[in-house]
Amino acid sequence: MDGISDFRSATAREAYVEVYDRVLAALWPVPPCPADVVTSLGTVRLYRHGPDGDDPFVLLSGAGGNALAWYRHVAELGVDRPVVAVDPLGECGRSVQTAPIVDGADAGRWLAEVLAAIGAERAHLVGSSFGGWTALQQVLHHPGRVGAVTLVDPAGFAPLGGRFYRWLVLGGMAGLLPAGLRRRAARRLDNSTLLETELLRLGLAGRRFRRRLPSLVPFTDAELAAVGVPVQLLLGERSALHDSAAVAQRVAGVAPGWRREVVPGTGHALVLDDVALCTRRVREFSPTRR
């Protein structure tokens, strides 16, 4: 259906799900605890870990990704707090979109409905790249149920430029190379995703998925200033997505209460470039925890 992300055929979906389940079994560090949440825009797949509570870490991957992108973080984050890793609606994964997502308000709506369904009252949203954009859309358009947000090299803070698209295309090509060449390309491109053989296999299995999500519109200064919850902003020093120093400077001017950090030696794939730092920063930034 036009305007709805989906696989090109039922056969393509079945083939993808088979690979997805194998990769989940290979990578997920704890016994998977899946659940499906029905929203007004589709059914959202999520995975729970950790103790019960109304203050989960809710993990949102970037464009083209899903919950499995967080496999290196789940166990540590769930030591003493609930974790919910999400297959974002409209991205390639086990979630199933049923209605168009036309703008940021829609992107925030499905997430708000998920938070309500899981009983979250003080969720800590953790969004990488496009997942960061989605997290802020929830806070701006459907406020409530969120106590804090961590943005990991998020999209939406500057227009997408040629440098990013070159990085994306070269990364896609490098993902098809043998492991040894991929390691060299990962260093040259500042892209740790190229070291993730299983995730690359999953991405290749999703090549017949059609993504139909709204074009990314950068946040205005007024929107950033209007965010009503504590925010932590982690930026990759060498990110191909934007000029990280300029983004940090902009945020310092319009949202001075945000915690800002440009992480040396990392790129746009910060969530994988420095897993330990990202996990530690998320756990430490819990301003609403009782």
Predicted regions and their residues:
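Active-site loop/oxyanion-hole signature of alpha/beta-hydrolase fold enzymes
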Residues: 84-126
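Conserved HGGG/HGGXW glycine-rich cap/lid loop of the alpha/beta-hydrolase fold
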Residues: 45-93
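Alpha/beta-hydrolase fold catalytic core
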Residues: 1-57, 80-81, 121, 283-290
